[in-house]
């Protein structure tokens, strides 16, 4: 097994997990906000309030900066949660460390599935429009390159 956070002392492992979670979370939210700006011409506040709506429901959309801040906090909690799960899974599935790029790409797809099939349905986020393949493909690519690969490389 390669030298990774798995082989480290607990405090070093925690540091690596947090680093991976914050790097992945930052890349992901930056990509999401950039995509939103390209599509709408609007700033990142709406993206962050959408994330906050998972807990606060529709009132998140009128909550201004405080709700956007909550959205950012919740976003990083999810990113760090995905990182912790990868950290737990990595030593149990030996083929994961044979090719960290492929592993990262696959983990990005997994992150998308968890988000769409578990996190959003269990949240207070308002219902979205019907499934759109193009939007799903963009979301998957963002998660592959901004969540999956960074977590796989850092862990």
Regions found by a protein language model. Give the residues of each.
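Interfacial helix-loop-helix junctions of multi-pass membrane proteins
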Residues: 39, 61, 116-140
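N-terminal signal-anchor transmembrane alpha helix
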Residues: 8-41
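Internal alpha-helical transmembrane segments of multi-pass membrane proteins
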Residues: 92-110
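Hydrophobic alpha-helical transmembrane segments
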Residues: 14-19, 68-90, 101-106, ...
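Extracytosolic (periplasmic/ER-lumenal) interhelical loops and adjacent juxtamembrane/interface segments
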Residues: 37, 41-66
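Aromatic-anchored segments of alpha-helical transmembrane domains
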Residues: 25-29, 108-118
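Hydrophobic cores of alpha-helical transmembrane segments in multi-pass inner/ER membrane proteins
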Residues: 142-155
């Amino acid at each position: 097994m390669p030298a990774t956070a798995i082989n480290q002392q607990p405090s070093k492992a925690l540091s690596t997990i947090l680093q991976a979670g914050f790097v992945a979370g930052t890349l992901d939210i930056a990509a999401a906000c950039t995509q939103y700006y390209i599509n709408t011409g609007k700033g990142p506040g709406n993206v962050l309030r959408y994330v906050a709506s998972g807990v606060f429901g529709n009132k998140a959309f009128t909550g201004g900066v405080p709700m956007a801040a909550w959205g950012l906090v919740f976003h990083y909690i999810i990113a760090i949660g995905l990182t912790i799960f990868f950290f737990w899974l990595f030593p149990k599935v030996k083929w994961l460390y044979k090719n960290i790029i492929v592993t990262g790409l696959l983990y990005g797809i997994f992150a998308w599935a968890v988000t769409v099939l578990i996190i959003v349905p269990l949240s207070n986020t308002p219902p979205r429009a019907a499934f759109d393949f193009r939007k799903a493909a963009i979301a998957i690519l963002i998660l592959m390159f901004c969540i999956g690969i960074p977590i796989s490389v850092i862990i």
